[in-house]
């Protein structure tokens, strides 16, 4: 039994297995009752590890648990029964961030490696999806190569945001535009696939369609 003491750090050594477990308790932020617990395993014995959570008092609430990014793990580590939702990385869950899923534009399917929403407190994330599968881009040396992943989708989304800001700045009487307004403009023009309910945890409000967003904006 490991007691909850905010701000405390506990180390536990399993004598025979020589495995050390470090448990650290934190508050996510001030004026918020959400708690953050770090559990670190050192020299973990191979096998199945089970973590039991027991409330200190009769109350209600949800528990979420995540593994570090795959690049930060050693060996094969995974949950036996995992949930693919609420799996995007920070700062994607921020209130003022623009969160982009990535999908295969040829097959119209979200990539299995794309993080999913919603947030812990049910904010709608991702905002929309952008192409991120086999995206051709410039690399050092004057060459072009294909890239796959959220970084490719983010680059496309950032370019789209820049074009929207440029277009607005050139309109008569333009007063500038905020990042939240740019996000809303993109969301307004998102493309929806038939038979899918939007918003959802994979696509957000749909796929980015910059031409449609600007066309709608032009008609307002």
Question: Across the structure, where does each feature detected by a protein language model lie?
Answer:
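Mature extracellular/periplasmic domains of secretome proteins
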Residues: 1, 86-99, 113-129, 148, ...
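C-terminal domain-closing interface element
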Residues: 195-220
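Hydrolase catalytic cores
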Residues: 1, 133-198
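Catalytic-core environment of secreted peptidases
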Residues: 18, 103-155, 191
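Beta-sandwich interaction modules
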Residues: 16-56, 63-69
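Polar, glycine-rich mid-to-C-terminal structural blocks
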Residues: 1-16
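N-terminal domain-start motif of subtilase-like serine proteases
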Residues: 38-42, 78-92, 111-114, 209
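C-terminal edge strands of extracellular/lumenal beta-sandwich accessory domains
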Residues: 57-102
